[in-house]
Amino acid sequence: LFITMFLKPINRLVNIFEQLQNGMTGFQRFVEIMDQKDETDTGTIEADALRGNIVFDHVSFRYENSDARDVESKVIHDLSMRIEPGKTVALVGPSGGGKTTICNLIPRFYEADEGTISIDGVDIRDLTRESLRRNIGIVAQDVFLFNGSIRENIAYGNLDATDEEIVEAAKKAHIHDYIMTLDHGYDTGVGERGVKLSGGQKQRISIARVFLKNPSILIL
C-alpha cells in the first residue's frame, strides 16, 4: 500500500515531464516558424498561361549558411540549360547533387545567387510569385493528404472541378482502378495524413491532384 502511494506521484511527475518535453519541441518549432523572414516579392508581371519555355543561364546557388567565399559550397554552379515546352526532362545525379534545389528555384522557393532563370523569355524574378506558382504543379516527395475522402483530396487541386474531371485525373495518375475496388469508391476516407493508404497510393492521389490543376509546368 505504501509503495503504491509512493509510486503514484512519481508516475505523475514522469508524465508531466514527458508532456513538458513534447510541449518544448512544439514551442521550438513555433519559434522557428515565427523567426522565418517574410517572402519579399519584387515581381510585378502577372503570368497568365505560361507555355513553359524554361532557360537557366549561368545559374549558381548556395544556401544561406554556406561560406560565400567557397566555390565548392555552391549546390549549383554555373548551370545553363533549356527546357522546351512539352518536353520531359529527367534530372539524374547523386543524393545532394542539387536536383531538388533546381526544382525549387523554378517556383522561386529560393532565389538564384548568380545568373538568371527565365520562362517564356521573362526573368522569373519579374513575375509575381503567386501567378508564377499558379502555373506550376509540384508533386512533393513528402505527400500531404488531409483527413477527408479521396474525392476531396484530389479536388484540392481544383475546387471547381466536376466529378468527371476528378475521375479523369485519377485515370491519368493510374489510381482510378484501385479506387473502384473500394467499398465507397471516391468517397472512401483516407485517414489523418492518408494513414489508410500505402505510400504509392498517396503519391498517385497527389499526382492526380496536380493533373486536375492542369499546370503549364509539372515538377515530379
Task: List the model feature ranges, each with a label.
Residues 5-33:
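Cytosolic ends of transmembrane helices, especially the final helix of ABC transmembrane type-1 domains
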Residues 16, 36-37, 66:
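Generic structural signal for alpha-helix termini and adjacent loop/cap motifs
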Residues 39-42:
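Active-site phosphate-binding and catalytic loops of NTP-dependent enzymes
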Residues 44-46:
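Short beta-strand segments of immunoglobulin-like
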Residues 49-220:
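ABC-type nucleotide-binding domain
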